[in-house]
Structures are given as C-alpha cells and as structure tokens.
Amino acid sequence: QDRYKKFPGDDNDAASRWTNPATISGDGNGAVGATGQATVIDCVGAGKDGENCRFWQHLRLSGFVGGDSGSWLAPQNAAGGILQAQNGALGLSALTICSTNLSGKIANAIDAQFDDGKPNTGQVRGTSNAAALNVTPTETAYVDDGGTVYVVCKTL
C-alpha cells in the first residue's frame, strides 16, 4: 500500500499499470475481496480471479514477491497449504493473511511466537474448521494429534 497507495488485489489502476503480463484491476474500495470470507478461497480455475487471488499477482508484478507474475495463484507454505489474503477472518478485521494446512504444533508455534498462543484470542487466530473463517474460533488450544490441521490468520 505504501508504493501505490492501494492494497494489492484492490488496486483499481492495476490493469493500466501492469500490461505485460496483463492483470485485472480491483474495485479500489479499500478492501481486498468481500468481508469475512466463509471458507478458504479457491483461486484455481476459470473465473476464480477475484481480488483475493489477484492480491498475489499484484505483489509479484510490483516486485515485492517473487514468482510467476502471470499467475494469480496463492503461494504455498512449507506444510503444503496456501497463503491467502482476505478482508477479515476469524473475528479479525481489515486485511488478513491466512495460512492453511498447518499442524497443531506449527499453528501453536506461530501463534505463540507472534501473539498469545491461543487460537481464539489476540492478533493471531486459528481454527481447525476451514469452513468457518467468518466467525471467531471457539477452540481454546491447538491440538497436536498428527491429524488435525489448522488455518492460522493475522491482520496486517
């Protein structure tokens, strides 16, 4: 937002700013996508190129993030999940970055390093219910049982 005065993905001048490769402009309303997306956002396939997906392409085109600047796919994390950008998640407001497919051990380490280590409070929040990103999580601790995976989100 510092360089272009707009959030990546929401930039309503993106199509004229970056023409090779081509991109799609956002609506310039100050938010990346709809508020509180209910689930993990799928950016794969035709018609799946909304602001949440274009967020990553705009960052690549601006040189802030490496990778194929023609792609709007979200980058993968080390656990095989994705990083996604959205306007609020898990009771957090404003631009939020979420990382999916994290084990309880990794989710707890991230939350403890940057916040309070509790999935339902603070500036870092997590849930094992990837279908309910639009509500505050109810879990009070991360479970490391080898099978439960989490989505962890933080407001930027």
Residue ranges of each PLM-predicted region?
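Low-complexity, acidic interaction segments enriched in glycine
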Residues: 8-156
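N-terminal alpha-helical signal peptides/signal-anchor transmembrane segments
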Residues: 1-7
